[in-house]
């Protein structure tokens, strides 16, 4: 009888990175990375295409910091197009001179508060100079992406998103190594050969090679690692994230195809590990869902503020439009839907900028330990050790009463 257990597979908590001799200071590293061969990011972060994570407000906020947001598809074609247009037409408020005057139209913050001192107006105005790392296209517009899947109106949706000048599309599926996904990529690439496509989600080298062969520009890795995803327990399918990234990287190594690690990021150290395993960037849902900029509902529970966080495989999300992501488009009876996600809530965490500051800081620190001046260095030169449960326990604060 053949051995069906092919190998051991590991995730973030199963490994730790080995520090290397380094002349690199965290403050000296570059976080710039490639999303595709045509699109670069100034920070390796994407906001997830989830209806409680990314609409135009989130996409604008993350693009201003150097990343990119992916507008979810649980809305009409026209609504999704308008969300893209809000990002692409976003304008920074005009800079006010230090004396409070300007030859340009005054920003709303100034005209709405007539009694502010001029110096206060200057402090409150938003300046282009405040966002030197903003992710912009060749026309100096903020970049943004959008998700599509296998729906009856997918090609029509793509056409409208292209008209809105979307920068990149995500072919969004729970199982990217599907003949339907492969055929959809072929159709889109035939009609729009210069449109960059992210395809996923996948976890194997074979899937990567098949998607690359039909024109995928970037691959999204992750089946089941997300905090609100239940695919691994409902369907029994998935590969732990570190191993999945490593396997896909094996197919993409020495090519210009980039990798996004999607799901399972809880700490900044997980970002470092994901990139060290072979990812060029990470996609985040949970950590961004609690921010001010997410479109999710605010909830007060036991006197504390939370925001809703809903898996795209949950019943409610499927009803709103994500059935096709899980190949249940033909199922029109809610009672017959098989969910692969849950609904929950996460603590309100304030501005996205503050969350990104912590994630970037942890990544920069890790790069310093590993002697990696660039994201590429981190991918190529890093090595892991497998750790025990006791090692994991040792890695977290222990034997103290925490006061912060």
UniProtKB/Swiss-Prot annotation:
<comment type="similarity">
    <text>Belongs to the IMPDH/GMPR family.</text>
</comment>
<feature type="active site" description="Thioimidate intermediate">
    <location>
        <position position="229"/>
    </location>
</feature>
<dbReference type="InterPro" id="IPR001093">
    <property type="entry name" value="IMP_DH_GMPRt"/>
</dbReference>
<feature type="binding site">
    <location>
        <begin position="285"/>
        <end position="286"/>
    </location>
    <ligand>
        <name>IMP</name>
    </ligand>
</feature>
<keyword id="KW-0614">Plasmid</keyword>
<feature type="binding site">
    <location>
        <begin position="222"/>
        <end position="224"/>
    </location>
    <ligand>
        <name>NAD(+)</name>
    </ligand>
</feature>
<comment type="subunit">
    <text>Homotetramer.</text>
</comment>
<feature type="binding site">
    <location>
        <position position="396"/>
    </location>
    <ligand>
        <name>K(+)</name>
    </ligand>
</feature>
<dbReference type="InterPro" id="IPR015875">
    <property type="entry name" value="IMP_DH/GMP_Rdtase_CS"/>
</dbReference>
<feature type="binding site">
    <location>
        <position position="340"/>
    </location>
    <ligand>
        <name>IMP</name>
    </ligand>
</feature>
<feature type="binding site">
    <location>
        <position position="395"/>
    </location>
    <ligand>
        <name>K(+)</name>
    </ligand>
</feature>
<keyword id="KW-0630">Potassium</keyword>
<feature type="binding site">
    <location>
        <position position="172"/>
    </location>
    <ligand>
        <name>NAD(+)</name>
    </ligand>
</feature>
<keyword id="KW-0560">Oxidoreductase</keyword>
<feature type="binding site" description="in other chain">
    <location>
        <position position="226"/>
    </location>
    <ligand>
        <name>K(+)</name>
    </ligand>
</feature>
<dbReference type="GO" id="GO:0006183">
    <property type="term" value="P:GTP biosynthetic process"/>
</dbReference>
<keyword id="KW-0658">Purine biosynthesis</keyword>
<feature type="active site" description="Proton acceptor">
    <location>
        <position position="325"/>
    </location>
</feature>
<comment type="pathway">
    <text>Purine metabolism; XMP biosynthesis via de novo pathway; XMP from IMP: step 1/1.</text>
</comment>
<feature type="binding site">
    <location>
        <begin position="262"/>
        <end position="264"/>
    </location>
    <ligand>
        <name>IMP</name>
    </ligand>
</feature>
<feature type="binding site" description="in other chain">
    <location>
        <position position="229"/>
    </location>
    <ligand>
        <name>K(+)</name>
    </ligand>
</feature>
<dbReference type="GO" id="GO:0006177">
    <property type="term" value="P:GMP biosynthetic process"/>
</dbReference>
<dbReference type="InterPro" id="IPR013785">
    <property type="entry name" value="Aldolase_TIM"/>
</dbReference>
<feature type="binding site" description="in other chain">
    <location>
        <position position="224"/>
    </location>
    <ligand>
        <name>K(+)</name>
    </ligand>
</feature>
<dbReference type="Pfam" id="PF00478">
    <property type="entry name" value="IMPDH"/>
</dbReference>
<keyword id="KW-0479">Metal-binding</keyword>
<dbReference type="InterPro" id="IPR005990">
    <property type="entry name" value="IMP_DH"/>
</dbReference>
<dbReference type="GO" id="GO:0003938">
    <property type="term" value="F:IMP dehydrogenase activity"/>
</dbReference>
<dbReference type="GO" id="GO:0046872">
    <property type="term" value="F:metal ion binding"/>
</dbReference>
<keyword id="KW-0520">NAD</keyword>
<feature type="binding site">
    <location>
        <begin position="309"/>
        <end position="313"/>
    </location>
    <ligand>
        <name>IMP</name>
    </ligand>
</feature>
<feature type="binding site">
    <location>
        <position position="394"/>
    </location>
    <ligand>
        <name>K(+)</name>
    </ligand>
</feature>
<protein>
    <recommendedName>
        <fullName>Inosine-5'-monophosphate dehydrogenase</fullName>
        <ecNumber>1.1.1.205</ecNumber>
    </recommendedName>
</protein>
<keyword id="KW-0332">GMP biosynthesis</keyword>
<feature type="binding site">
    <location>
        <position position="227"/>
    </location>
    <ligand>
        <name>IMP</name>
    </ligand>
</feature>
<comment type="function">
    <text>Catalyzes the conversion of inosine 5'-phosphate (IMP) to xanthosine 5'-phosphate (XMP), the first committed and rate-limiting step in the de novo synthesis of guanine nucleotides, and therefore plays an important role in the regulation of cell growth. Essential for mouse infection by tick bite and critical for the survival in environments that appear to lack sufficient amounts of guanine, guanosine, and/or deoxyguanosine to support spirochete growth, such as mammalian host tissues.</text>
</comment>
